[in-house]
């Protein structure tokens, strides 16, 4: 079992400053640095992963597009979507990347099950799905044995912008969200449940809430 997982609740934050802060944290951390999870919502933004292709951006319109260094293709972030950035020393956890992805997916599956929603992972398409519709996306980057980027769970948001792209590079991929499957949902409650599931599935002894900025 690992040590203490530090968790920061950042609220609503623009995407690019958080991206830069993740990169700095990953580059500057040492062998004893505490692993952290940053929980955040973003204003509307499309992000292109390293495998992203321009043809999957159909009609972005007024929503900005940001090129990132995570895995995967294009996705959408917006208010009402819970994003968790996983800043983990994967070597210290002694797990491979595939195992990390599987644990994150199971974290989401168990979280959704706590709301009575049956979700599954797909071996050929990272993320979590309910009856074929995607409810959570996953994209990581590993640098020097440390992960950054993470997961995005659709909780209670406007799904319309997903129709402006081919989500994750799949034309016509249906998207869904927790509100439509389980009724009215408090994002704070989902955030709390996600914290507990991450600690359990990533095998940390406990969690602690971190305060202060990420500059």
From Swiss-Prot:
It is found in: Cytoplasm. It comes from the Bacteria. Pfam families: LplA-B_cat (PF21948). One of its GO terms (cellular component) is cytoplasm. PROSITE patterns: BPL_LPL_CATALYTIC, LIPB. Substrate binds at residues 70-77, 137-139, 150-152. The record marks 134 as: Lowers pKa of active site Cys. The keyword Acyltransferase applies. SUPFAM superfamilies: Class II aaRS and biotin synthetases. The keyword Ribosomal protein does not apply. Pathway: Protein modification; protein lipoylation via endogenous pathway; protein N(6)-(lipoyl)lysine from octanoyl-[acyl-carrier-protein]: step 1/2. InterPro entries: aa-tRNA-synth_II/BPL/LPL, BPL_LPL_catalytic, Octanoyltransferase, Octanoyltransferase_CS. GO terms for biological process: protein modification process. Residues 31-206 form the BPL/LPL catalytic domain. One of its GO terms (molecular function) is lipoyl(octanoyl) transferase activity. In the reaction, the free carboxyl group of octanoic acid is attached via an amide linkage to the epsilon-amino group of a specific lysine residue of lipoyl domains of lipoate-dependent enzymes. This is Octanoyltransferase. It comes from Pseudomonas entomophila (strain L48). The lineage of its organism: Bacteria, Pseudomonadati, Pseudomonadota, Gammaproteobacteria, Pseudomonadales.
């Amino acid at each position: 079992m690992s040590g203490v997982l530090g968790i920061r609740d950042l609220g609503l934050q623009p995407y690019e400053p958080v991206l830069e802060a993740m990169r700095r944290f990953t580059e500057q951390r040492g062998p004893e640095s505490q692993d952290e999870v940053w929980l955040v919502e973003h204003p509307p933004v499309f992000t292109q992963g390293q495998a992203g292709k321009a043809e999957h951006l159909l009609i972005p319109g007024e929503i900005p597009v940001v090129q990132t260094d995570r895995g995967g293709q294009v996705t959408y972030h917006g208010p009402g979507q819970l994003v968790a950035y996983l800043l983990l020393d994967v070597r210290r956890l002694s797990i491979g990347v595939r195992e990390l992805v599987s644990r994150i997916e199971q974290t989401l599956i168990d979280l959704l099950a706590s709301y009575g929603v049956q979700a599954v992972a797909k071996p050929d398409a990272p993320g979590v799905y309910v009856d074929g519709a995607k409810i959570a996306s996953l994209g990581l980057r590993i640098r020097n044995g440390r992960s950054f980027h993470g997961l995005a769970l659709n909780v209670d948001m406007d799904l319309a912008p997903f129709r402006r792209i081919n989500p994750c590079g799949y034309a016509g991929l249906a998207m869904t969200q927790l509100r439509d499957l389980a009724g009215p949902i408090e994002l704070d409650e989902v955030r709390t449940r996600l914290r507990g599931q991450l600690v359990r599935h990533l095998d940390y002894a406990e969690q602690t809430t971190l305060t202060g900025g990420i500059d």
